[in-house]
Structure formats: structure tokens, C-alpha cells
Amino acid sequence: ILSTSPDKEGVIQLDKETIGECMQKSILRYDDSSEHYDTISAFIKSLRGSDATAATYYLARMIDAGEDPKFIARRMVVFASEDIGLAGNGALSLAVATFEAVERVGLPEAKYNLFHCAIALARSQKSREITDLMNEAFALAHKYPNSPVPLHLRNAATKLMKDLGYGKDYKWQAGFQHEKGFLPEEVREESSNR
């Protein structure tokens, strides 16, 4: 700062480069929204690509830039279901525990939790099954929003409802497969064609 010349009014103007030189470390350019989104995108894509080294690099950059650690943890919670899903059911529990640790512990100590989770997510098997089934379910629900629930699946809370066939032939047991299935007929026909 002492080597910086003052302006016409005698004021020394400080910019990022000058401050960075004083701190003897680089300051991450994180001053616009595109850098924020580009970095989190690279982080998530590194997790998806099973590259723990790249994921931790982008994680360190975000932390150094002052990114909200809860934002990072939230993204890992979503990633655990979206990209790992049923291939690693423990991933969601780890990500949620990481979010809670970040909330309770805070930085700088929560860095350990964030890195632990990121490395584990990167090394986990990946599956898009949840995402694919969710998208299919919403597509069917949007196409058939008012298809009536089949009678055998309806709640038979009264004698009249039972007389109308509500809940008929339904058995309450694990793995019970009703001959008419569990979807409205028009939805069942389309879903079996997928």
C-alpha cells in the first residue's frame, strides 16, 4: 500500500490486485453471478464425474471466495438423491448430516464436513433412476391429472363405500400384487408401453 501513489486528492485507491499483493495471496474473482454459478456447476459436474480431486479443488475455491457453506451443503443434499440415489442410499444421510454440521459448527471447522461429504459423493456409485422415475411420474400425472383412483385402492371408511366396491380384494401384506395393479387403467396402459 505504501508503494501505491495517491490520486490528485491525495487518496490512495485500493483495488483487488493491490489488496491481493498486500495479503500475499490471490483473490478469487467471485464478484459476479456468473463466476458463482460457473464454480458450483464445475463442482457438481466433478462430483458427477467421480473426480474427487476436481470436486475438492472447486470446493476450496468456493470456500476461499466466501461462498455460503450452507449453499454448498444444500447442493450436495440435492446431488445425493439426484445423481447417486438408489446406488448409495447412505449418500443422502451423509449429505443431510453435513448440512446440519455446517449449520451447527460453522466455518472454519465445517470445512472438514464439507470435504468429507464431497469426497464420499464423488467416490459413490451413481444412478439416475430416481430422477428418471420422478420425471416419468410427473409426466404421467400432468397428462392424466384427474384419472380416478381405482376402486380397489380407495379407502373403504364406511359400509356404503364397501358396498360400492371400495377396497375390494385388497390385502394388507408386504408385496401384495393386485391383479388390477395400482394405477388408473389409462395410466397403467401408457406406463407399460414405456
Residue ranges and their predicted role:
Residues S3-L28, K70-M76, L133-F138, L151-H152:
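Conserved C-terminal helix/linker of AAA+ ATPases
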Residues K16-R61, R74:
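Conserved helicase/translocase motor-coupling segment
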Residues G49-A54, Y58-R194:
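Terminal-proximal interaction/regulatory segments of ATP-powered molecular machines
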Residues T4-L14, R29-S33, D83-G90, E103-E109:
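Conserved C-terminal "switch" segment of AAA+ ATPases
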